[in-house]
């Protein structure tokens, strides 16, 4: 499978909105309206096969020491073949380039993230996320997502024994 993972462009926005919307309608991710994707376009990475969008995700910087992977989705037809891994690796590389030491995600698929060097943590250990976003979510008191985090900076990653190259070699 020949998949290209790259930073999103203006022309990708309608497909990103449609794909994320597909999963949002099922309650798997939060919706991202077009204006939100346009405003945050530089945060997005897309995966394409033969020019067609097959997956996407975004990296949101929350503070100097922390970023979040959001809206990670892959079309069902190519799930399980490494597209999600490639998107996450692209987002981790961007976090590394920006020198953000840690990246987290809230997910219903912690096993996927564990294979990429993420560890489970209590949501309460992410107070910036809780106060900024979670407090306003309709699922706040009954959240079914698991918080996972991993070190990105070479120093932090080596302390955890998980360099990005160890999990992102293609």
Where are these regions (language model features)?
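Short amphipathic alpha-helix that is part of the acyltransferase structural core
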Residues: 1-31, 46-48, 145-147, 154-170
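Short active-site oxyanion
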Residues: 3-4, 97-103
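Short, hinge-like loop/turn segments at secondary-structure boundaries
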Residues: 23-24, 120-123, 139
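A short helix-loop-beta-strand connector motif used in the catalytic cores of GNAT acetyltransferases and
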Residues: 36-49, 68, 141-144
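Conserved beta-strand in the GNAT
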Residues: 46, 52-61, 65-73
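Conserved acetyl-CoA-binding loop-helix of GNAT-fold acetyltransferases
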Residues: 74, 80-95, 105
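Conserved active-site alpha-helix within GNAT-family acetyltransferase domains
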Residues: 101, 107-135
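Cysteine-cluster motifs in flexible loop/terminal segments that predominantly coordinate metals
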Residues: 131-145
